[in-house]
């Protein structure tokens, strides 16, 4: 276990947008809203982003991170995530970025727990989801749960906003305003995740899931999801 406070720089590296996990290639459904004209400027993307943080990231990724910290096995959580991530592209995005994070983490932030999870994935006994790979690394570094949640959620917000700046498109200053506003959503989500019950896992807005499913058949696409 890392000494108290010694994890900050490692956590910044782990959540940096330069970490090559492939997040730049995923809209996680907002490209469908762009195609339908529902997301078209700073304000409309901000509405989508707030809903995504408050719903999908809270009840899926965030809750999985919390449960892993509380002692639920990553094998059990991996199976639950695979089952409740209904849109195929979203499921594949989670495992592609998660598998890449496992590869990076094994070399840069090695730990017995991370090696065990990667071995399960390599043996085909787990899918290798991004939030679990992140949580295993963060916990091994000694990052407290609330900081781990906030860092993961804000990293997701940052990559999605960067992708929206390219796709809508938006100005760079607009992107920074969105990030500042989203910090309040992230703080609220961290608090909410701490209160959720096991039965809340996967309780995602159908509208978000439908948009992610429609993206598979969208004729022109910038993103893989």
UniProtKB/Swiss-Prot annotation:
It is found in: Cytoplasm. InterPro entries: UreF (IPR002639), UreF_sf (IPR038277). Pfam families: UreF. GO terms for molecular function: nickel cation binding. Keywords: Chaperone, Cytoplasm, Nickel insertion. GO terms for cellular component: cytoplasm. Its main location: cytoplasm. The keyword Chaperone applies. The keyword Chaperone applies. PANTHER family: UREASE ACCESSORY PROTEIN F. Belongs to the UreF family. UreD, UreF and UreG form a complex that acts as a GTP-hydrolysis-dependent molecular chaperone, activating the urease apoprotein by helping to assemble the nickel containing metallocenter of UreC. The UreE protein probably delivers the nickel. Required for maturation of urease via the functional incorporation of the urease nickel metallocenter. This is Urease accessory protein UreF. The gene is ureF.
